[in-house]
């Protein structure tokens, strides 16, 4: 099977937005217009193709990033009539599923940022935008739901500029808003596009409506000024009053979009079939191909030497596994992006993270949850492999004779945990295996056993995250389980720097044990985790025992000195010690490391930390006082407030422990008229009275 489409005509894109901005409906329309669907599915009737889990269909939200492939030839522009392949990842908008967005953006070359014309920039829009900035992903903005009452295109553009610190440049302006939304003015071609009222999929080109001529001229000048700033020759033409051609505008707009210095803004109503085809044209015109992204850098797994791979079919194969999913028919599916070379079904790949070789059974091109077998994938492709048993999210797959490790993905730590237990003996046998499969799929989901009680604990990014995973246990794995009350994932750290000696000696007949270590224990800045420094000089501790000291310290960090919670953001330096020729062993130094760390941590002003959440509440004005008073009573700190789309919003930082059950309380407080969103912000020190109570609770072993 030869390459269907040249590499410069491939677009790997994500659709990213806040929940309810219309992502899944927009993707459905894309599939319909590109000929992949014969009937359009609607989210509100549970018929959307990209939402294929039962829970997604029930809740009308997207949980997993469904991947699909389609083809599009633009009707206008610099690529007019040329067939392009578009690989789309439909990402979730709920904050509990940010990991799906994060891992999608890592392997994409561009994104369509969707905004609701009524709500504008919402909290999840900010979160996703930050994630896209982190990976330097070029974007076009699509202001959706222009047909809704209260839609305001220009206000949304203003909020993109102010709240996201971006440079939005409209290349269309709407003709009418709300119920009278009829189409838009194309500012590049200076033509009006009016849609057929019945189905919206047909349109006609008209002269710009008389009442919009001045506004269209103003916004065209705004667009020309923005692109002129990027290109000196264009600036000269603009200042001299010369005509700038459509082709020149598109060319420079593309360059600026790829540098993320301009965000082209379009408008439409996906539900009413208006604007989607032109958004597809913009994807082809302005977003990157794998060639624009150029080389990726990695390193050799053994020598750590830098290794560069280019998007070229003739180079050795290198790809990144960005998602693991369990498919009811084919088993474990590994979604991967090919960065260089080609991969045939049936061939072997090296997992350079584990060092293991595995065989690719089949290679599948995914269309939401339907699949199509293909013989070969090429540089720039996104596909799914069957047959890889030990691959984890973020692993590099490569040619065994040319190993490379690509940059790994970093995922946030879970902030909430619950105890889970099987309902019956039959469930008990399946629970462990099923939880392990779910943990394989989702790097922010953790499973552990509490050492004190023997209970199984599951941890995740929020209540909805864990609720859906427990629901999947029941539906997909047929495991019934009872769950306890949610618990906060507290952490511990230290505030001072101390030196401490850890000594383990046992010499009472027979072979003894001897290990002595001198450690410096000090705080690291937030988010740095753990750092171990080997500063031993002159062989006072043999080299083979040093990893054991490190292992002992890490073991001790799992069970903190304040209330037994895991410790974080700590640097430990091993600078001296002693050993015994006969009695020293790895075990002795592991225990000495553990004793030294625990003793040092107790003297280093240890503190208890709790997760603080960034909360936004949107409420009718009459309930504003109640909402703010309630947030303050939850130890919340009000950060700001304002007005948006006829409602008041409040920004606050609140401890997670005070937010359990908040949705129910907010509903009753506002008669169901307010809503809120919440995301993890950082860990902060727990007030002394609460820390004391947690300590007492932990001592009595009633915590779980």
Curated annotation (Swiss-Prot):
Signal peptide from the UniProt entry: none
A GO cellular component annotation in the UniProt record: cytoplasm
SMART domains: EFG_C (SM00838), EFG_IV (SM00889)
SUPFAM superfamilies membership: EF-G C-terminal domain-like (SSF54980), P-loop containing nucleoside triphosphate hydrolases (SSF52540), Ribosomal protein S5 domain 2-like (SSF54211), Translation proteins (SSF50447)
Cell compartments where the protein resides: Cytoplasm
A molecular-function term among this protein's GO annotations: GTP binding
Keywords noted in UniProt: Cytoplasm, Elongation factor, GTP-binding, Nucleotide-binding, Protein biosynthesis
Pfam families cross-referenced by the UniProt entry: EFG_C, EFG_III, EFG_IV, GTP_EFTU, GTP_EFTU_D2
Listed InterPro entries: EFG_II, EFG_III, EFG_III/V, EFG_IV, EFG_V, EFG_V-like, EFTu-like_2, G_TR_CS
The keyword Protein biosynthesis is annotated on this UniProt entry: yes
Residues noted as binding GTP in the record, renumbered to the chain: 17-24, 90-94, 144-147
Gene3D superfamilies: 3.30.230.10, 3.30.70.240, Elongation Factor G (Translational Gtpase), domain 3, P-loop containing nucleotide triphosphate hydrolases, Translation factors
Gene Ontology terms: biological process: ribosome disassembly
Domain tr-type G: 8-291
Described function: Catalyzes the GTP-dependent ribosomal translocation step during translation elongation. During this step, the ribosome changes from the pre-translocational (PRE) to the post-translocational (POST) state as the newly formed A-site-bound peptidyl-tRNA and P-site-bound deacylated tRNA move to the P and E sites, respectively. Catalyzes the coordinated movement of the two tRNA molecules, the mRNA and conformational changes in the ribosome.
Cited HAMAP family: EF_G_EF_2_B
Record-stated family: Belongs to the TRAFAC class translation factor GTPase superfamily. Classic translation factor GTPase family. EF-G/EF-2 subfamily.
Protein name: Elongation factor G
Source organism of this protein record: Chlorobium luteolum (strain DSM 273 / BCRC 81028 / 2530) (Pelodictyon luteolum)
